[in-house]
């Protein structure tokens, strides 16, 4: 995997210790079991998905390595349920996205037990103060950090390096169940194709107007 490659490269450059390398390898070995447990959250997530069906828009926030997960969550919600959604880096919220927050806006917040957890929680407080409904997706050990969240989805504790992998699972389940509750076709989303059709570039094609 890319993570294993990055770990090997970091070790070769003397950037991590042998102990840290072994910790990461052990965490990778345990990841399939954690994903399996997280896939059992359908019943917990279904009520949240039902509440999202009435929303016109939603905001996804993630800081540091969880920013791409926020983008993925927003994309999946748009693709499957046709609800407008945007993903942003939590630390950038003050520079524009905060203007989108209004009373009752669903804010799906991604939080890991890492060095930026405190800052991320502070960003979420600002969203709450402006009327945002916080749906927190986090590890079990970090759930109490945001005690003002309206709803909390917890996954097993995981190494911070692997948090994006594990937190992506409930984000995708939420999008899937929201679409299911709305009655949209999750297998054939509107206007989307599962394959890409492209024109082969040839000298003849280049001459066409």
Regions found by a protein language model. Give the residues of each.
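Hydrophobic transmembrane-helix microenvironments that flank and shape a buried ionizable site
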Residues: 76, 169, 204-205
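Phosphate-moiety recognition in structured ligand-binding domains
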Residues: 1-4, 8-32, 105-200
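Residues within alpha-helical segments
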Residues: 71-75, 121-124, 128, 207
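Single conserved hydrophobic/aromatic residue that forms the stacking wall/gate
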Residues: 201-209
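Active-site phosphate/pyrophosphate-binding segments
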Residues: 1-106, 180-200
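Long alpha-helical scaffolds
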Residues: 49, 149, 205-206
């Amino acid at each position: 995997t890319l993570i294993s490659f990055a770990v090997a490269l970091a070790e070769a450059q003397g950037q991590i210790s042998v102990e840290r390398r072994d910790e990461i390898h052990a965490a990778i070995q345990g990841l399939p079991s954690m994903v399996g447990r997280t896939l059992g959250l359908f019943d917990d997530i279904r009520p949240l998905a039902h509440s999202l069906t009435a929303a016109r828009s939603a905001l996804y926030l993630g800081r540091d390595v969880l920013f791409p997960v926020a983008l993925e969550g927003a994309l999946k919600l748009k693709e499957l349920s046709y609800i407008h959604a945007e993903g942003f880096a939590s630390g950038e919220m003050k520079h524009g996205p905060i203007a989108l927050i209004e009373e009752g806006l669903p804010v799906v917040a991604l939080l890991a037990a890492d060095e930026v957890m405190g800052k991320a929680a502070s960003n979420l407080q600002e969203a709450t103060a402006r009327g945002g409904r916080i749906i927190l997706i986090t590890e079990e050990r970090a759930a109490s950090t945001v005690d003002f969240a309206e709803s909390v989805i917890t996954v097993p504790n995981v190494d911070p390096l692997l948090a994006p992998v594990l937190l992506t699972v409930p984000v995708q389940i939420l999008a899937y169940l929201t679409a299911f509750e709305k009655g949209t076709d999750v297998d054939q989303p509107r206007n989307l194709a599962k394959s890409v059709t492209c024109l082969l570039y040839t000298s003849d094609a280049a001459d066409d107007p």
